[in-house]
């Protein structure tokens, strides 16, 4: 309740679609900090849950990896290629992939916070004064995240007990957002980071 009062205005229209531009750094290496610059555009729909993320990750000067990550009609899909020609990863439709992509949608909903309203299918369960568990079901997939709010009532962190990195191992996954600013009448974070806990 406190979160919605902090980030939404009275009468805030429900966000139906969003287009985002992103830039940042991406670490593809599990063993060491090896950060690569990326740029991306992302389209999100909230009435039929989904997103389409198109990213370009600079591996070395002149060598880019292209990553297309989607959640559409209840199915997660990831395709990564070098130079847009050579496929290096392809995942589609496995329950583990669907779970991971729906978790991503739920975590990123801080950018389109009306999607977190109970009227939009999110079930909230208070844990304490600053934390609550949000659960979202889409078709056969159900996911939960624990969100923690800052002193102002806006979301500061989220955490999933288990998100699949691949079809074998699920590990704790967490995110942090900050630098809140008003956009289209909503208070949303402009910066964030996510990753698996080792």
Model-derived features with residue positions:
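Short hydrophobic alpha-helical segments that form membrane-spanning helices or hydrophobic packing faces
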Residues: 1-7, 190-194
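N-terminal mature ectodomain segment of secretory-pathway/periplasmic proteins
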Residues: 5-86
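Short, exposed beta-strand/loop patches in secreted or surface proteins that constitute
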Residues: 11, 41-46, 69-71, 121-127, ...
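Short, hydrophobic/aromatic-rich segments at coil-to-beta transitions
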Residues: 14-21, 46-54, 127-135, 156-157, ...
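Short, solvent-exposed secondary-structure boundary motifs
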Residues: 26-38, 53-62, 107-119, 134-140, ...
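A short, polar/proline- and glycine-enriched secondary-structure boundary/capping micro-motif
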Residues: 61-68, 87-92, 144-146, 166-171
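Flexible, processing/modification-adjacent segments and terminal tails
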Residues: 79-138, 168
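Gly/Pro-enriched, hydrophobic low-complexity segments
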Residues: 133-198
